[in-house]
């Protein structure tokens, strides 16, 4: 164990075998090309899967759309930044001169949180990183009360995100209708001219296909840093 990180290891609840992975996860691109961005990409996927799995198992009667919305609440930037701060990650972030003072910035905290997850995964295995993530999230997950959560359908949520960012609403159109009358499959396309996005999805009705298309577009917007503002 590297002495200066022993306290941090205790806070994280994980001891790195290869501490250089942790260093990389804490290093902002303003410092060096060997930064956390690739680990952040990996950690984002690992976190999303772990949270999706625990919600699927815990809320057995919750429909797909609501599970997706609940997951979004748990992995949104504000939540990740708060968790990063509670784990004292801000005290260990390595920044270049141009970013000094950025330790408390929400976007940097969010990115580092995901990068540390990616680093733990590479340093161990999926079972281990899952255990660590669930320990960090335990207070949040145990306090979920579905009766107090306001769920929105995906089209409404997408509309709100776009309007909050002064963007025009998408245009939905049916591309194809396949199958017999009693088992039709609708393919719907949604186009956002402002963002130059074109997304398609299928469903057993036009309404379901449009909702799935909206879900896909929300995910794409999230990757670009556009989230619903609270």
Swiss-Prot record:
Looking up InterPro entries in the UniProt record yields: dsRBD_dom, RNase_III, RNase_III_dom, RNase_III_sf
Give each disulfide bond as a residue pair: none
Q: One GO biological process from the UniProt record?
A: mRNA processing
EC supergroup of this enzyme:
hydrolase
Give binding positions for Mg(2+): 40, 111, 114
Protein's UniProt keywords contain Nuclease: yes
**NADP is among the record's keywords:** no
Q: Please report the stretch or stretches of sequence annotated as the DRBM domain.
A: 153-223
Q: Known Pfam families for this protein?
A: dsrm, Ribonucleas_3_3
CDD domains attached to this UniProt entry: DSRM_RNAse_III_family (cd10845), RIBOc (cd00593)
**Known catalysed reaction(s)?**
Endonucleolytic cleavage to 5'-phosphomonoester
Domain of life assignment? Bacteria
Q: Which GO terms describe its molecular function?
A: double-stranded RNA binding; metal ion binding; ribonuclease III activity; rRNA binding
Q: Which family does it belong to?
A: Belongs to the ribonuclease III family.
The name under which this protein is listed is Ribonuclease 3
Give the source species: Francisella tularensis subsp. holarctica (strain OSU18)
What's the gene? rnc
């Amino acid at each position: 164990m590297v002495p200066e990180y022993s306290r941090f290891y205790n806070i994280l609840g994980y001891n790195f075998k290869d501490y250089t992975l942790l260093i990389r996860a804490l290093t902002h691109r303003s410092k060096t090309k060997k930064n956390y961005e690739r680990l952040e990409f990996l950690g984002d996927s690992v976190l999303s899967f772990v949270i999706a799995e625990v919600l699927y198992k815990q809320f057995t009667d919750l429909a797909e759309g609501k599970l997706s919305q609940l997951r979004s609440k748990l992995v949104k930037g504000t939540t990740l930044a708060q968790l990063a701060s509670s784990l004292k990650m801000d005290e260990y972030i390595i920044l270049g001169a141009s970013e000094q003072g950025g330790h408390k910035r929400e976007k940097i905290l969010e990115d580092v949180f995901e990068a540390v997850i990616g680093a733990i995964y590479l340093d161990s295995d999926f079972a281990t990183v899952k255990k660590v993530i669930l320990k960090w999230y335990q207070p949040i997950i145990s306090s979920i009360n579905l009766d107090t959560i306001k769920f929105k359908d995906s089209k409404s949520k997408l509309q709100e995100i776009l309007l909050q960012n002064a963007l025009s609403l998408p245009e939905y159109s049916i591309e194809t209708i396949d199958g017999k009358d009693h088992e039709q499959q609708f393919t719907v396309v949604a186009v956002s001219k402002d963002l130059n996005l074109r997304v398609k999805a299928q469903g057993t009705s036009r309404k379901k296909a449009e909702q799935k298309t909206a879900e896909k577009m929300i995910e794409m917007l999230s990757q670009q840093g556009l989230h619903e503002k609270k």
